[in-house]
Amino acid sequence: FPTLRLVCPHLAGTLPYIVGRLDHQVNVLKRGPRNLARSPVEYLKSIWTDVVSPLPLAIKFGHEFFGPGRLLFSSDHPWVEPEVIVRCVS
């Protein structure tokens, strides 16, 4: 599904933190699918994610990892003060 657009909530959970291990498994140890067109990190950076996190450092990391064009504002509760999110990505 090359045109499928994915949104992973809450800064994509732990994926940005373990994607280096996934890349290593696929590219160095030759485990997993053999016909990937791109590395796991490239696939992960092509998704969209929301910036719902109570930790400003996590929001900043998401901004650096995904880039501002892949971050979405969303809310299911006033969990994080919007001012914190704006301050972190400004």
Name each model feature, range by range:
Residues F1:
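Basic phosphate/pyrophosphate-binding loop/patch that engages nucleotide-derived ligands
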